[in-house]
Each structure stands twice: as C-alpha cells, then as structure tokens.
C-alpha cells in the first residue's frame, strides 16, 4: 500500500509569497520528523526523507510520499505518523489542547505550520492522508490552530506526581540530560521526560520495558495535560497491571478510606452505622 500526504495552501498568499509557502511545507516536514522520533525507540536527526509526487504550478499544492524510510523507522510507523499529524491538526483547529499522540514539541511545530495561514478555510490549508490514492484522513487548518496550540503549550501548573506507561525516543548526550518520551497507559499522552545523571542505571533498566512509573516534577497546561516531567525516580512495573485482593477491596488509595471498603466508607460519609 502506498501512502501520501497532500498539502494545499489556499488564498492569495499561496501564489504570492514563495518564502512563506516553502516555510510552511518545511514546518510540516519538521512536524513529521518529531512525530516519527516519538514513535521509535531511539530518535534520529535524519528521519524519513520525502519526495514530491505532485507539485502544481501557479499555486501551492503538493503531494509528498516517502523517498527513503529512516533506519530507526518502518512503513507502519510512517503511516501512523501521517495519520497522527493530520488528525492532530484537525483537533488543534477546534480545541486548546495538545493533540492526541503529539508531544509538546510537536505542538510547537504545529504552531509554525499554521502561523502564516489566514483566519478562514478559504485562506488556510487543506491536508489529507491518501492510501493508494484514496483519502483516509483530512483536515482544514487555519490561523486558529496556531492560537490553540500556543495556548495548549503554555505552562500553568507545576506539581509533584507520577505517570505510568512505556518509554521511547531516548536521547543522550555528553553535555545534556538524558531525555525520553513516556506514552502513558491512561489517557494516551505522549510526555517528554528529562532524567538526572543519578538515574542513569534506573533508566537503562527501564528501557524498552512494557510498563514503568516515572515520578517527578510535572508541568501541566490549563487543560490538565502534562507538558513535561523532570524525573526523580523510575520504578519498573509488572508487564500486566496487577492488583492484590487487599487493593481491590480497599481501592487504589487505601489510606484515603482508612482501610475500609468502598461501601463502608460511603456509608460512614453519609452518617450510617
């Protein structure tokens, strides 16, 4: 199956400002690279390369297809990336939240994609994923997307807590903290996580584990979505979520109920015997 991405810039700016138009296309390619890196075990500066399958004169309408799949990726990842990109742009057009499957960095790149667009679809951009020539995902993108993503990436609250999920996208360097992406098992968030050097051993043990719990300083946006985590602890978890009989009787937070089961606790709140 062949997979392609169609981009169609509308309005007078599409045929007038070549620099802005090319910058928009470049921002789309940067967004695809970021989404691809968050999907794979280890990211790379050299992601999948793309070629123009169609490029029409007199307007900015083009169709991109994979030219060479990156070594750290595969065809299934590339197809997921395209669907995630288009679906996410559609979500960002309607809500001030980080789109499903996007990191905060992807949201910042999405801002760049939409920054030069107009305020209505007739001066915006149409994007579509095509599989074997058939449209399977579409979105209309306007300047509203840039405003919504800017609001979504603005930090509003810092707390201390934890999230559970699977680590991917590990980046290491001599002069920078190790970084990775946590795909949460609840809510499906894709969260950038930074680790201190003191967590190097724990990080390597946790790498490619199905389930880990990362504890640390959590930065959230106004919608309660996690923008990033500065980890202070990593805990390895069983492959499948497991609860003991005691946990099932008393709940996930038995201290909250004083060890009582849910029925007794609610009756006590109501003043029952």
In which residue ranges do the predicted regions lie?
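Short aromatic-glycine-enriched beta-strand elements
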Residues: 173-183
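Protein-protein interaction interfaces in oligomeric scaffolds
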Residues: 1-142
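Extended, charge-rich, solvent-exposed interface segments
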Residues: 238-273
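Short nucleic-acid-contacting surface segments enriched for D/E, G, S/T with interspersed K/R
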Residues: 197-215, 226
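OB-fold and OB-like beta-barrel modules that bind single-stranded nucleic acids
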Residues: 164-169, 209-218
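OB-fold/S1-family single-stranded nucleic acid-binding modules
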Residues: 219-247
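Short boundary/loop segments of OB/S1/cold-shock single-stranded nucleic-acid-binding domains
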Residues: 143-160, 203-204
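Structural detector for short beta-strands of small beta-barrel domains
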Residues: 158-175
């Amino acid at each position: 199956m062949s997979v392609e991405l169609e981009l169609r810039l509308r309005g007078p700016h599409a045929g007038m400002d070549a620099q802005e138009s090319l910058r928009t296309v470049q921002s789309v390619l940067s967004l695809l690279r970021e989404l691809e890196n968050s999907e794979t075990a280890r990211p790379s500066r050299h992601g999948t390369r793309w070629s123009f399958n169609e490029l029409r004169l007199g307007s900015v309408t083009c169709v991109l297809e994979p030219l060479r799949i990156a070594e750290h990726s595969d065809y299934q990842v590339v197809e997921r990336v395209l669907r995630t990109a288009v679906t996410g742009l559609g979500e960002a057009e309607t809500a001030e939240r980080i789109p499903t499957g996007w990191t905060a960095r992807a949201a910042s790149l999405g801002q760049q994609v939409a920054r030069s667009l107009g305020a209505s679809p007739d001066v915006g951009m149409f994007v579509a994923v095509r599989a074997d020539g058939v449209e399977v995902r579409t979105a209309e993108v306007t300047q509203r997307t840039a405003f919504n993503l800017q609001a979504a990436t603005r930090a509003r609250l810092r707390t201390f807590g934890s999230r559970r999920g699977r680590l991917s996208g590990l980046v290491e360097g001599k002069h920078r903290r190790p970084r990775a992406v946590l795909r949460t098992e609840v809510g499906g968030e894709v969260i950038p996580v930074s680790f201190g050097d003191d967590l190097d051993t724990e990080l390597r043990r946790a790498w490619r584990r199905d389930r880990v719990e990362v504890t640390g300083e959590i930065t959230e946006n106004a919608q309660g979505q996690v923008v990033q985590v500065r980890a202070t602890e990593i805990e390895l978890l069983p492959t499948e979520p497991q609860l003991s009989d005691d946990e099932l009787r008393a709940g996930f937070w038995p201290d909250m109920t004083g060890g009582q089961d849910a029925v007794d606790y609610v009756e006590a709140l109501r003043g029952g015997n």
